[in-house]
Amino acid sequence: MSIPTETAPTIGRIVHYKLSGHDVSMINLESMQSFGGQGVIRSPAKLGDILPAIITRTYEGTGTAVNLQVFLDGNHSYWATSRSQGSDHGQWSWPPRT
C-alpha cells in the first residue's frame, strides 16, 4: 500500500507555518496592544520560525491556499490569510511523519 504524496488541505488539520518578515512585523505590532484587558505574553517571534497552525478555511479551486490560526509560544495567536503550501517564508507545510 502506497502513501499519497499530496494531501488536500481540510479545515481542522494541523500544519507547520514558516513566519515571513511581514508576519513578524504584524505579530510584534499586535504584541504592543492589549486584548481584552490582558497583555500579550509570548516568546519573541523571529523570521523563519516554524510554528504549529490549524487550517480554518480552504478555498476551492485555488490549489493549496488556506487561512490559518498560527499558535504562538504564549497567550496569543496570529491569523495568516490566503497562504499557500511550500517551504518558503509565509507558507505552510505538512508536519513530517515520524
Regions found by a protein language model. Give the residues of each.
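Short, Lys/Arg- and Gly-enriched loop/turn segments at beta-strand edges
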Residues: 22-50
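Short, flexible, surface-exposed loop segments at domain boundaries
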Residues: 21, 43-44, 60, 65
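Basic/polar N-terminal segments that are highly enriched at the extreme N-terminus
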Residues: 1-6, 31, 37-39, 96-98
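Short, well-ordered loop/turn sites that connect or cap secondary structure elements
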Residues: 8-10
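Short, charged beta-turn/beta-strand-edge "cap" motif at the junction between a beta-strand
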Residues: 4-5, 14, 18-25
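Intrinsically disordered, low-complexity, charged/polar segments
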Residues: 56-98
